[in-house]
Curated annotation (Swiss-Prot):
It holds the Pfam family Peptidase_S8. This is Uncharacterized protein aq_aa18. It comes from Aquifex aeolicus (strain VF5). One of its GO terms (biological process) is proteolysis. GO terms for molecular function: serine-type endopeptidase activity. Belongs to the peptidase S8 family. Keywords: Plasmid. Residues 1-189 form the Peptidase S8 domain.
Length: 221
């Protein structure tokens, strides 16, 4: 299906996703990367509204956008902490809030292919094993990891419970109103709490909460 087509989420891909969600499978999709959407060029602070496309508009999946989390050059990186320029903005065409969450995705250090000629050992680590990447695909991996950590302690959680877990642990940004259609559920991070078992001193780090916030950007919504 054309990922650049205007949709409200009620397409065949949406039906497939919902079928998977009904069977208990938790699904997440990226919230679009690229310079154009529906012939509109995106601006440096995250594009324009109504640019989340199918399957990101699906009703029950977790749609993930990206924010600028790791500047490569702090002297010239003006977008740190804000929505990434390539990350699509909501809402859907029928007014639903999307994306559901944004996570760090600009830049993220990730593993490098042995066949890749690209490397930057001064940013991530020595050698050619890790390289910086940017994209909503990187942010989606962050959220996927958080969901996996949650499911370790809640093996039988249904998709709605996982989404509620994110929402109930939201930490709002003092400078914005909530909810909104840009950052939506903004910065997804996790906090670890050290707990002790019995009388021993062996500590166990457990996922305590996921924190993210809703933001209202300069669009009057």
């Amino acid at each position: 299906m054309d990922s650049g087509k205007d949709t409200n989420g009620y397409e065949r891909v949406w039906e497939t996703n919902c079928g998977a969600m009904n069977s208990g499978l938790i699904m997440w999709v990226i919230s679009g990367s690229g310079s154009f959407s529906d012939h509109y060029e995106r601006d440096p602070t995250g594009g324009i509204t109504f640019t989340v496309t199918n399957p990101g508009t699906s009703k029950r999946v977790i749609t993930v956008g990206a924010f600028a989390s790791r500047p490569l050059d702090t002297q010239s990186f003006y977008n740190a902490g804000r929505i990434a320029y390539f990350s699509s903005r909501g809402p859907t065409r029928n007014g639903r809030i999307k994306p559901n969450i944004v996570a760090g995705g600009y830049f993220i250090c990730s593993t490098n292919s042995e066949f890749s000629s690209h490397s930057d050992p001064y940013i991530c680590a020595e050698g050619h094993y890790y390289v910086p990447f940017a994209g909503t695909s990187m942010a989606t991996a962050v959220v996927m990891g958080l969901v996996a950590l949650y499911l370790q302690d809640h093996s039988f959680a249904i998709p709605e419970e996982v989404k509620e877990w994110f929402s109930s642990n939201a930490v709002e940004d003092d400078n914005f109103l909530y909810p909104n259609v840009v950052y939506c559920s903004e910065k997804a991070v996790y906090v670890l709490e050290t707990r002790f078992k019995g009388s021993g001193k062996t500590s166990e780090q457990k996922l305590r909460r996921v924190t993210f916030s809703y933001r209202l950007a300069e669009m009057g919504l």
